[in-house]
């Protein structure tokens, strides 16, 4: 969102996966959770994946703390800034996502040239996020053709 707002000249298309533009786009418990975030509570799959690409584990704590602080200090993106986005935009969330359907619908209404897709599953499940993968996971099979169709569309 920020790149499309700040540098529209370099953005041809946007795919917003579980994007948050307003604090009220998630339930109140989310903000309490982020204030209490601790590395010990981070899913093991994410810690393992981090260590596979960055063996210096001290960076994991730094990344975690910065991400948590960034979320705690999150500021709403104004309606004017959102409405300024002109690039074709695909908005995707899961039907059990932490991002509320109402928030995704509001983004869709504010971004003139947008499409909205709500896929079965939780946060990130539709793209095979590592903590959601199960033997019978098929959600990414829904979203890949939707993304390909969106990206293949000719823009005016």
Question: Residue spans of the language-model regions?
Answer:
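Helix-loop "lid/cap" segments that line or gate small-molecule binding pockets
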Residues: 35-41, 45-56, 66-73
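Flexible "cap/lid" loop of the alpha/beta hydrolase fold
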Residues: 1-6, 10-46
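Short beta-strand/loop motif that positions the catalytic acidic residue
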Residues: 84-85, 91-93
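Catalytic active-site module of serine/aspartate enzymes centered on a nucleophile-bearing elbow/loop
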Residues: 120-156
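Active-site nucleophile elbow and catalytic-triad environment of alpha/beta-hydrolase enzymes
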Residues: 65-81, 95
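Conserved alpha/beta-hydrolase "acid-adjacent" motif
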Residues: 98-103
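Short, conserved loop/helix-junction motifs that constitute active-site signature segments
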Residues: 82-86, 109-111
């Amino acid at each position: 969102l920020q790149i499309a707002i700040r540098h529209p000249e370099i953005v041809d298309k946007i795919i917003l996966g579980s994007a948050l533009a307003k604090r009220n786009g998630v339930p109140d418990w989310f903000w309490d959770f982020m204030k209490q975030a601790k590395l010990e509570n981070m899913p093991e799959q994410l810690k393992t994946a981090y260590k596979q690409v960055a063996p210096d584990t001290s960076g994991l704590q730094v990344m975690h703390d910065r991400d948590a602080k960034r979320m705690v200090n999150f500021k709403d993106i104004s309606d004017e800034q959102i409405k300024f986005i002109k690039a074709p935009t695909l908005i995707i969330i899961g039907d059990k996502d932490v991002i509320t359907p109402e928030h995704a619908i509001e983004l869709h209404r504010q971004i003139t040239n947008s499409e909205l897709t709500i896929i079965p599953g939780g946060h990130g499940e539709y793209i095979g996020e590592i903590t959601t993968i199960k033997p019978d996971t098929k959600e990414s099979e829904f979203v890949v053709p939707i993304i390909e169709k969106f990206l293949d569309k000719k823009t005016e």
